Amino acid sequence: MRVILAWTVLAVTMLPTGCGRTDPKPVAAPTLEPKKLDAAIRAIDSYLAADKPSEAVFVAEKLASEAPGLMRAQEIHGRALVALAMQPDLPSQDRADVMARAADAYDRAAALAPTNAALQHAAGVISDTAMRHPQAVAHYEAAFAADPSSAQYALYLGMAKARDGEAIEARRLLEAAERAMPESPDPKAALADLELRGGDPQAARIKIAQARALAPTSIELRIADARMRRMAGAPHESLELLLALDPPVRREPACSQEIAAAYVALGQVREAAGTLDDSAAAAPNDWKRALRAASAWMQAGDQVRAMISADAAGLAGAPADEVRAALSATSDRRPGG
């Protein structure tokens, strides 16, 4: 479930990933002096603490190339790349490219420590964020195999299994996580998503309500609740939940896309397009937002505004084929999807 991934993508990269009790001895890097290694890692950590990810990546890339067999070097390279990818002013395509490089770095680190549960879990989350779902599943499975007592690892593996359509195994893992973490909203939110995938939106609404009761101020769960209500045939309730939020929150992609979907469910396609247009205007460097707006305006029958949004996307770096696809949108496609 993307909601939970969004909460933890940075947190997991900060987990201690040194050798655990079940880890094999890491491959040595005989060409790199210990003092040089420690100095490089201190420099990278210092740059990250000072919010200078570009400088951190520069040092980390050199370290990783000089010590390809050292897990610490590969892991901190991945961590620096994640920090760079999460910079708010980075264009969306650049962010995707950097996150893909981070996933590669975490793959290399995880291969050097196959039984390091924390590292495998972190590699899974980064792979998921980079939209490399098969790799993510493999890492989640490795983390859970290394530490089957961890409810967190069961939760993430369960979410991955749900996404792959393995409903029975997903339910087993998610219910185990729920029993182990009764005060956490995350397993309940994941079970709500599983119910929705299984075609039972009413059961999903019940479960997401339980999750929200444990975290009533969570914006992510509020959006998930709105989605469940819309899918259960109550788009008015979905809008009531989301339009009450502050405008900057409503303009964020997850929220604006759900608002647009609710408007479409009500037959208000121009309102849907306007919602996505406002979101795009709030982040002019994000061409994906602009293309969503262009597609929505096409579906609303406003080719002029669609072209304006498409031009904005092109200026932000959108690939030409993506722009053409947005301008070919038909009423069969839902704005914000």
PLM-predicted stretches and their roles:
Residues 18-100, 104, 335:
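N-terminal leader/linker segments that initiate helical-solenoid repeat arrays
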Residues 66, 112, 146, 179-180, ...:
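Structural marker of alpha-solenoid helical repeat scaffolds
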